[in-house]
Amino acid sequence: MHNADRTAIGVDLGEYNLYTASPVKMPDSSGAHTICGEEICARLDELRDRVTALLYEGADRETIVASVTRRRDGLLEEIDAAAREICEYANAYDRPVLVTEDSHYQPDLWTWLTAPNAHRGTAWLLPTAHLRLRAVADECGLEVATVPEAYSSQECHACGVIGDRPDGETFRCTNPHCHVETLCADYNAAKVLARRYYPGRRCAYRPPHSVSRGEPPTLVAERRSQRLQRPP
Ligand SMILES: [Zn+2]
C-alpha cells in the first residue's frame, strides 16, 4: 500500500459541473468543490454560431481563424482559472494527489465548430479541461494520477455496486444493504475516482443475471506519470 498515506482527490469532469473534486472520505457533498461549466458551454455555443455566420457570409479563412483564436484563448483562461481553483482546493489536504479518468481524447475545436453532429463536451471541452487541469497541477507542483474510467459514473462510491441515474444529475444506489440512497452523480463519480487510486480497490460490479463467475471487470487503480500536452 505504497500510496496509502496520500490523500487522493477525485476530479470528475462534465459540462454542467466542469470540475467536481472530492477526497474519498468526504462525509457529504457540501465539502466537495464544484465549478459550474454552464457559462463556458454557452460561450462555446456562441462561438459555433459565430463561425456558422462567418462561413455563411463568405468570410475569408484569416478572419475566421482570428475570431476563433481570440475566443478560444478567452475560454482557455476561464478553464485555467477553474483548474487553479481545483488545485488550491486539493492543496489544502495532506499529501494530495489529483485523480482523474484515464481518458485519451484529444481536443478538436474545429470539429465542434463545423461538424453537424459534434458534441461540444467530447469534441473539445472535456479533453481540454482534463489537459489543462493536469498542466495547471504540474505548474502548482501537485501530483496527478489517472485510474480506469469504466463504470466510474455508474458505480456507487460506498459499495461498488452499479446504480442508476434517474434524472441524469442524480445517482441512486440499487444495493438494498448500502447506506447510500441518492446523491449528486458528479460528487459520487469524484469519490469513485478517488477510491480507485488506492491499491486493491476494484469495481464490485456483477451483471445481475450473469451465471459466469470470477470475471468481474477488474478496475485496479493504477498510477501514471504522464507529461502533458498543451491543447491546440
Ligand atoms: Zn451503494
Where are these predicted regions, by residue range?
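Positively charged, low-complexity nucleic-acid-binding target-recognition regions
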Residues: M1, L131-P232
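Substrate-contacting helices/loops that form the catalytic groove of nucleic-acid
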Residues: M1-L126, P208-P232
